[in-house]
């Protein structure tokens, strides 16, 4: 019974995160509309609330294209894997009710965020384009260099909180 409740809780968490991302993009569009002195997305429906749902319908009904010489399976699996990794990060966050008991939640967070780098590299490699591969390798090198400083800052905060 506890497993079913934790599964329902994690599914509810994932749905809330995805819906909140949709409405944060709506907020971003509204702020950009006010900054640029133009009409924002608040003209659709009631205060623009249906806009994220219309965007989702538009994205799901678009024609899917892929490079002709690409590795088709890894070209489409790598963004999906990246999405799942970013959703797994939310499972280790402490909430009022613990979904899963993590003794090493910080290490799980660092592992999931560092694995997200390699999906960019696989997407660049699987397109069979030299430019996409170089861009993926550049993104990997840049992200790894930022992760080292992030981990050192996190360990410094952890060390000073223990003293």
Swiss-Prot record:
It is found in: Mitochondrion inner membrane. It is a multi-pass membrane protein. The keyword Mitochondrion applies. Its main location: mitochondrion. GO terms for cellular component: mitochondrial inner membrane. The chain crosses the membrane at residues 3-23, 77-97, 104-124, 143-163. It catalyses: a ubiquinone + NADH + 5 H(+)(in) = a ubiquinol + NAD(+) + 4 H(+)(out). It is an enzyme of class 7 (translocase). Its EC number is 7.1.1.2. The keyword Ribosomal protein does not apply. Keywords: Electron transport, Membrane, Mitochondrion, Mitochondrion inner membrane, NAD, Respiratory chain, Translocase, Transmembrane, Transmembrane helix, Transport, Ubiquinone. GO terms for biological process: aerobic respiration. GO terms for molecular function: NADH dehydrogenase (ubiquinone) activity. InterPro entries: NADH_UbQ_OxRdtase_su1/FPO, NADH_UbQ_OxRdtase_su1_CS. Core subunit of the mitochondrial membrane respiratory chain NADH dehydrogenase (Complex I) that is believed to belong to the minimal assembly required for catalysis. Complex I functions in the transfer of electrons from NADH to the respiratory chain. The immediate electron acceptor for the enzyme is believed to be ubiquinone. Belongs to the complex I subunit 1 family. This is NADH-ubiquinone oxidoreductase chain 1. The lineage of its organism: Eukaryota, Metazoa, Ecdysozoa, Arthropoda, Hexapoda.
